[in-house]
């Protein structure tokens, strides 16, 4: 009997496997979702399974908390303006060392441990991410002031060729969000936005934001207020009405950016929920919030 | 919580999916296992799922009961010698019409209904199965007598080219066990033996016999006596000791034939058990009997 | 001298071989043209030769007389409305068994015997023919009445992928005209119409109707009245003037359907004429009637 | 009736077309066989037909008579030793101009005129024929004397890559027998021998020598003494017994060279016989002499 | 130190190598530029180097002086009208023998000697150049008179398929400017014009005219008056003002023809300047005159 | 004149470009050779040029000095035994961050800046380097003692698939020498030895050690004592005689390892010499020491 249930559950996944066969899913794997070994294992197994059943995950990861820790170790105080890290030369060096030299490799190792073949990359390789310095404006005394965030960039162009090759050869690409400008300078990118840009360029079907919240909720302390499905206009309405505020707003903007770039749906799931990615994709009800254009 | 269990079950399949990735499994789908709609649906879903997760099923089907019914309708009495159907011209016509014209198409339809792409074939297409008339001997009064079974054949050569093309292009081939001799005459083949021959020629990893028994049991009425794993020598021992008798013996010979042809393991499962194929492949304990060389 | 003539005849075919190189010809092989062994050999040899000289035949076959015989054997009376077979469940079963289980295999065998590589298929495999139930209307007392023909369908969509693969790999596809509707039900198709639909979908250059008449004649008893070449408007004119009547009209409609679907020319030839297909294609004068758009 | 005969003749070619499908035939087209326009047309049509029915002709041509004429026009006297043209620098220039600049192009033109796609080459292109200076010995007063033939070479290595590409892309290569030594000097090659070397390197099934004789005859004036099939040992026997003498001996040696290099059969046919190549290949009895190893 | 200079020079070529990577350059190699062994070596080495660094040269050669010499040897007087050779049948034969049988092969040999893989072709092979008889008009007594130049043609269509294959397989094609009309007659083509036509058809980036002058100069005796870069309108201006006259005008027209056909720039360089092709391409200043559309 | 010299120098490289076309060169780029911006530019330009002229560089880099600096900044003292870095967990983290997160990216950036397409990798991606913990022995009081170096490994297996794909798609792979053991733990590898192992696995023609010495010299202060070419036995002789001592010995062992693994020649060049790689490859005399088997 228990056996039968197992089989039924496998079979339940079949329509989803058929539907998403050969599609690309961009997984934005946030630093806050990498809280413990177990959570990291859940994600890794989910992504390897996706790959084996014919869906192509492409990972863009963050690493904010770890970067902060490394900075503090070196006696530097992290500073953010509008959710973007102020990045001087020394900070950029730390960002790259932590993202590319540590977190990226850890994700690759986990994926390979569970049977996947992964390739760690930054936006520097194969001219993957061409970026330009981001000009940030701030309103002060009802005047627009230009703020210098340092070596912070925004995506100008994504050259998908290298990723296409790797995906086609059955690798899972794992990308650190560092871009290069036309002078060859590295730039620190916001991982959420970059993920949306890459998803759009790759014609990804879905962008799945693996975060540390369950999704968009009316009341963050009440799981029953979680929205399963929202349209952009509903979200804009919620922002206007003050239901969505603070740190969530830049993430929401990244979601809308992805939809604008051609992604069909964006999903916010909680990396601390066991196998959240798999459940969001392979079950009717899902576990997080799905955002669609309309 | 229930969600979590679902995901865990999917993930449990991962090592098996990795291990069998890109391999070929020959599914011998027996006529006695096609007892009802539900059982046929279970098998079809299992095979489509296998295909989508990167394992390549190739189906060889039987159809004995249905052939008998058709013959009786036409006023002919089915006759068997040593488990092989005596096949005159008229019988051969009925065999072909039922196998190729009915059962094969029904299997193809089921597979396509659940999202697979299937192609129905007989051994006549693409010179798939070159056969020769089978010479059957009988011991009578301690004398070896040659028996004429009529248009009954045994496989001489399997040309895998057509199947290779179809498998590579992501189709599930469904094969009726009719062969052709060098004069172009059709011959009725024993589906169990033919399945083993095709499995060997295709370098299939497994031959899965979907039957109407749970496997090899010491006492057919006591499920607890089911053997999970047997070697050829253990089986030979069981035959010698009289544990395996009667109608099971030709099937066992077909299993040994497959192992001789290079198949790594043969599995006997019960098509009436829900999702028997999936459970046999994707769970540690399995549901039937696995036979290996040693 | 005789030798020389032989060579000259081979060479005469050269311009046609050049002209039609790599093109696809849809051969509608009618049940009435399969009258005897010799006639079946002629056709088979013609098609194998076409394949070897670089022209790609695709066969769609009928089988009306054989189906009628099988039905009568089972005590059923064939019934037709407007040339379409009224098809209840039992009839459909017989149609499939005869077409797929018998005639299709016989054609495949013949082709393979003369050196071709053939693959027998029905519209069920590889989602080849998606069909829908045909709604037939009848005029009665100047009122349009809807007639239920049972499991009779018309082609909704032809998925050419499987055929393309087989043709490219140098197989001759032989197709039984059975389609599948969106619920997975099989439907009996008119072979003439289906052949035109497949020809159009495959971008076939020619549709060759192998029948039991020499072509379109003003007087069916006077061979000298055979038309070698007709345009659609000439044919419409002949119908209006009553030169073409009765059973020929549905066939003519099938020809016009094929031209509408993009076929360059439709040819009606007599399968009882030795090597009619070859002669129609490879000689200036031809042996049957060619119909072109204008 | 006449129509029927035509078709039968086409069909008679079928077994040969099947048998030789995709094989390569090396056609040595001798200068003496290019006697008139009509004969040149026969050969060209034969080769184009071969190509279209799936057999791949590769042409190596001679041009002795035309070279002699050109030399005489320039006031030079052709000189031969053991059938090899003594070749000083000026002669080599004439040889190249006539072979590459005239005869090769004429053959290409004829082939293209009848629907073929041909490419004219010499052994200079694509390092096709690496040659070395031929050391010729002469017995004089029972002493072996080395003779300097000038710029005459023998094949050292055939690089088949260029020809393989052209054949695969459906071109007919037409090759002038000029080789290049390791210092980059051009060398005049004996076309018969070179044809055998190229045939061997290309794994050609047949070498067909298109000459101005009907084959090997016991009495050159009695057509009835023509041998249809000979083995090497039979030929050696004939030479010993004096049946084969004079100018025929070097040609025979070229035939044996080809068989040694792996060609299955060598055919000697008369280019003045209409469609000799076609008849030799596509009829049971042939028109010339076939030589096989044993 | 000297070593360092060597390396610097190699490195200086890098931006040009990057820029022109995988592009096609049409090299028109004029007969007047083949003056001596050394000059021929320079060109050959330049082209082989280009090929190895990833730029694809395609050579169209002339051979006027050599043709004249051959004609005179045969007692014929070369005759030109408006720079086009009057070409009777005998002249055409000489043209083909010299161009295809001699000069083409010499270029191929040189290229192969320096490590290239070259293939000699005329416009006759692979239907490369389809031409038509050129109608030439002359003004006489202010009347337009049609002049018969004999077998002189102009390009009607270039079939790039053969060249594409050869370039892709890493060969350097060397083309003699002989075309074929629709009746299969060979026609003598002006090499300058043909080179432009082929360059356009092949989507060549550059047409490089290797001549015996340094480029376009205001005063042909004063090297310092050489124009490095000119636009079409500047050139037209120069012609109008009488700076460009005589034999240079047809060459200029050929340049403009190439630009019209889509070539990005045409270069006139002096084949007697050591490595003129390399220097023109790989140095900032160049050595000849570059002509661009505007 | 100067122009001519430039061209001559380009042409001088031609034989080397031909000879090494399509081969793979493993470049071991040592940390001591990355002393200044200019030296890093020289190397980057050299490698990009190699790639463009058809030679495939694969880079394995070191980074010792930079790792030391980073460790010291964090208050850790680098410790070496027999030239291998003692590597505790914290050290390994620093090693990875510096190698993968900083140096690797810097090399990639330089290569891309000069027109190359580079991909940064560690041995973790695509299961590139499977390693095992290195057991190091020390002789102490004439007793062999096992020393624990911590997370230090040696290459067990190189999976070339990912590199093969990247090389074939025209990328320059840049590899940080970090391996993974069977438990998924990262291990710090000696870059010299790893470079030889990868070179052998990739069938590289050459291993070029870019160091901070000019090569092997009898007297390190006397440039004139530099050996241009040495065999293994000559080197062993020099070691025995005490000409090669100290820090050079492990490097020499790495060279011999590479030759053992099948590399044809190992070159030691000085990264501070302008364009040392290019000069070593493209000039007769070279600039460093070449070591060959015999």
UniProtKB/Swiss-Prot annotation, chains A, B, C, D, E, F:
Name of the featured protein: Acetylglutamate kinase
Subcellular localization: Cytoplasm
One term of GO molecular function: ATP binding
Broadest EC class assigned to this enzyme: transferase
Pfam family, one: AA_kinase
Transmembrane domains' residue ranges: none
Cellular component terms (Gene Ontology): cytoplasm
Keywords assigned by UniProt, alphabetized: Amino-acid biosynthesis, Arginine biosynthesis, ATP-binding, Cytoplasm, Kinase, Nucleotide-binding, Transferase
Domain of life, per lineage: Archaea
Reactions listed under catalytic activity: N-acetyl-L-glutamate + ATP = N-acetyl-L-glutamyl 5-phosphate + ADP
UniProt binding sites for substrate: 63-64, 85, 188
Site residues, Transition state stabilizer: 28, 251
EC number: 2.7.2.8
Lineage, top ranks: Archaea, Methanobacteriati, Methanobacteriota, Methanomada group, Methanococci
Main localization, broad class: cytoplasm
Function: Catalyzes the ATP-dependent phosphorylation of N-acetyl-L-glutamate.
Gene symbol of the encoding locus: argB
GO aspect biological process, one term: arginine biosynthetic process via ornithine
Pathway(s) per entry: Amino-acid biosynthesis; L-arginine biosynthesis; N(2)-acetyl-L-ornithine from L-glutamate: step 2/4
Sequence similarity: Belongs to the acetylglutamate kinase family. ArgB subfamily.
